[in-house]
């Protein structure tokens, strides 16, 4: 305990700042701590932050490129779709024209067949009528002759 009293008695009471050996020692400690923190913490963290910023910037650039590529592909696909629609429309128009032509041709053939059948039927009926007239005329002549013969014989 006497040592403590002696240690306290030998230290003069200072003012606001005491310029003794503790100040340079503290300055050396701060400088060493700064170098240590810089070497062990700030540089690795700074490198990680720089790497992350680089990754983000390359990711953004890649995203912009891919977006531009997607927009180009979308425009190309829109053009292809437009062309395909026009081609389909052309095929539909051609098919409709072909069907219309086939319909008209079939209709003309059916009308011609109907007219031919009608004409054949008319000729057949006319021939049968003439045949019936001839038979009737023959029978009328025969009956007339028979009636005249019976009237004269009676």
Curated annotation (Swiss-Prot):
Alphabetized Pfam families for the sequence: ATP-synt_B
Alphabetical keyword list: ATP synthesis, CF(0), Hydrogen ion transport, Ion transport, Membrane, Thylakoid, Transmembrane, Transmembrane helix, Transport
InterPro entries documented for this protein: ATP_synth_b, ATP_synth_B-like_membr_sf, ATP_synth_b/b'su_bac/chlpt, ATP_synthase_B_chain
Domain of life the protein comes from: Bacteria
Membrane spanning stretches: 22-42
CDD domains, A to Z: ATP-synt_Fo_b
Role: F(1)F(0) ATP synthase produces ATP from ADP in the presence of a proton or sodium gradient. F-type ATPases consist of two structural domains, F(1) containing the extramembraneous catalytic core and F(0) containing the membrane proton channel, linked together by a central stalk and a peripheral stalk. During catalysis, ATP synthesis in the catalytic domain of F(1) is coupled via a rotary mechanism of the central stalk subunits to proton translocation.
Protein family membership: Belongs to the ATPase B chain family.
Name recorded for this polypeptide: ATP synthase subunit b'
Species in which this protein is naturally found: Synechococcus sp. (strain CC9902)
Gene from which this protein is expressed: atpF2
